[in-house]
Amino acid sequence: IRLSLVGSEMCIRDSSGAEKLNGLEVDADLRWDLLTGLVVAGRAGESEIDAELERDNTANGQKAAAGARAALPSAAAKEAAWKLLVESKELSNALVNSASLGFGRVHDLKLLEPYVDRYFESALHVWKLHTFKIAEYLMINLYPVYLANEALAAKTREWIAKPQIKEIPALRRIM
């Protein structure tokens, strides 16, 4: 099966070149899943996200677009997503959840490496700035789990052991 973009339309072709696969209904959710996969792979970008959002400008479409934008595979896109998520209060709970999940979707893990230290440096600020639910989404979804190793585990234990963190049991439990 091959997925490609033709203009603003997604085409699914089987090995014979047929564009329609029997039994496969490509609805809005599947289009977003496929498009986000293309975004992560660097095969689609902002213009395709905008075109799909124009086609599916629903609450679910808004969430999917936020996740797809945060998944764009460039340092500039990751920085923009980080700032929007961590430093602003612009997004709703649902959009924060979708975008923060999209942030970690990468093929090149090097895109996430700059955010390990920044995660721990900003965690307490995030906790104080945002509502509980948004802070919970950010703390869980932005945690650099894809970069898991002994150094990250040690850094996490060290952060949890800080006196100011010990005073916030809910934050410690999330971590």
PLM ranges: what are they?
Residues 2-4, 8-175:
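Long, ordered, helix-rich scaffold segments
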